[in-house]
Every structure is written in structure tokens, then in C-alpha cells.
A protein has these predicted regions:
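Short helix-loop "hinge" at the ATP-lid/N-box region of the Bergerat-fold HATPase_c
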Residues: 134-135
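Short beta-strand/loop element within the Bergerat-fold HATPase_c
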Residues: 141-153
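Short conserved segments within the C-terminal catalytic ATPase subdomain
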Residues: 100-110
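Conserved glycine-rich
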Residues: 207-208
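Short alpha-helical segment of the dimerization/phosphotransfer core of two-component systems
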Residues: 54-62
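Acidic ATP/Mg2+-coordinating residue in the GHKL
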Residues: 161
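Short conserved segment of the HATPase_c
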Residues: 166-180
């Protein structure tokens, strides 16, 4: 039974990766043509300009989606044997997110450190996605705290925000592909709806688990538990 499920998931990943790969070129051409048309026709009517802006935004969203789907389909092939120190990585992520956090007036703070074995690129993506999500769905002037605690053979990462909270009935669903709690804010900030799904995939691939630790109208904390050593077998965690 387990072998059948693994084969089904592998086939699904292969199909998803192939579909995303085939979409990349036509989407890039669409984006280029839209940019060219906009540059050559700067004085179009307001309603046409608004329509062109909408087309560019939706094309960019589709490009982001295909990029994320390609990442997800290729995760199994990524080596996971690098030594990773998290504190410097988190500071780098804060620097990359500074334009967004400054724009929204959200303060970023970090505490703790830890060392683990895994894929540097994937763990960066995991923490980046969680932190970016916490910034996007925060209150104006809010804060995000990323903390790391190391305990013998495991490492606990927590990302806490001062946002509006996640309803209890959605706390497992948020890690499923394309699921969004607040669709209006998702439209405002773009994105493919795959950020937290990718977090779950990366965590699972490193033999860990991810969950909503607590959430209320005062904010949310998402906790990721990872083995500190070289364990890389998927945990098989259920998010249904």
C-alpha cells in the first residue's frame, strides 16, 4: 500500500513538473509581449491601461506558480548533506525581505541559533516562505519573530506574527497547495498559493514536521521541528 502511494505521488510530481516546464516558455513570451505593448503604447485609455495592468499581474502570478511547481517536482533530487547554521541564514532572509517589511511597517526580530544537516537552499526557502507569509498577513506596524531552539538531536524553529490569526478549521488546510485563508489579501500581494505547501514538502523531505502551534486574533505561531542530524527520509506526515 505504501509503495503504491509513493509511486502515485512520484507520478503526480512528474506530471506536475512536466506541465510546469511546458508552460514556462509561452508564459515568458506572453509577459514579454505585454511589456512591449505597454512600452510602445504609453497613452492608452485608462480602462485599457487598467486591463493591461491586470493582465501583467495575472501573467506574473502564473509564472510564479509554474516556478513553485517546478521546485516542488524537483525536491527529491536535491542533496541534503550540507551543514547549515541558521542564525546567519535568518539575517540574510531579513535583508532580502527588508523592502517588503519596511513598506508595511513590520519589525523583524530573531533569537537563538542552531546547526543542522540538510539542503541549504531548501531550508532557506522554508524559512523565507514562512517569514514572508508572516509579514504579508500581519497588521500595519506589527512584528515578526523568528526563533531557533536546539535540543540534542532536534531543532525547533518558530515564526510568530502579530496578524489576524487563522481560524481553527483552516489550520491544517493552509499547508495544502493553492489554499488561501484570506483571498482578498492574496490578490493584493500576489503569489501562487504554494508557499506553505512548499514549506510542508521541504519539512517532510528533511524528516521533520510543521504545524500551527497557536493562533488567535493577536497573531499566529508556526512551528517547524527538524532533526539536527543527517536524517533525510520523508516523515510521511498527514495534512489532509
Amino acid at each position: 500500500m505504501l509503495e503504491r502511494l509513493n509511486n502515485a505521488f512520484a507520478a503526480q510530481r512528474q506530471f506536475t513538473g512536466n506541465a510546469a516546464h511546458e508552460l514556462r516558455t509561452p508564459l515568458a513570451l506572453m509577459q514579454a509581449q505585454l511589456e512591449l505593448f505597454s512600452a510602445e503604447h504609453p497613452d492608452v485609455r485608462p480602462e485599457t491601461a487598467e486591463f493591461l495592468t491586470l493582465l501583467r499581474e495575472q501573467t506574473e502570478r502564473l509564472i510564479q506558480m509554474t516556478r513553485a511547481l517546478l521546485e516542488m517536482s524537483n525536491l527529491q533530487q536535491v542533496a541534503r548533506n550540507e551543514r547549515i547554521q541558521l542564525a546567519p541564514m535568518i539575517e540574510e532572509i531579513f535583508t532580502d525581505l527588508a523592502p517588503l517589511s519596511d513598506k508595511l511597517g513590520v519589525t523583524l526580530t530573531a533569537e537563538g541559533d542552531g546547526i543542522m544537516t540538510g539542503s541549504d537552499a531548501l531550508i532557506y526557502r522554508l524559512i523565507f516562505n514562512l517569514t514572508e507569509n508572516a509579514v504579508k498577513y500581519n497588521r500595519p506596524g506589527g512584528s515578526v519573530r523568528v526563533s531557533v531552539t536546539q535540543e540534542l538531536e532536534k531543532l525547533l524553529l518558530r515564526v510568530s506574527d502579530t496578524g489576524y490569526g487563522i481560524p481553527e478549521e483552516y489550520r491544517r488546510s493552509i499547508f495544502q497547495p493553492f489554499f488561501r485563508v484570506d483571498k482578498s489579501r492574496s490578490r493584493e500581494y500576489g503569489g501562487a498559493g504554494l508557499g506553505l505547501s512548499l514549506v510542508w514538502e521541504i519539512t517532510n523531505l528533511h524528516g521533520g514536521c510543521v504545524r500551527v502551534e497557536e493562533s488567535s486574533d493577536k497573531g499566529t505561531t508556526i512551528a517547524v521541528e527538524l532533526p539536527a542530524g543527517a536524517e533525510t527520509e520523508p516523515s510521511g506526515a498527514d495534512i489532509s
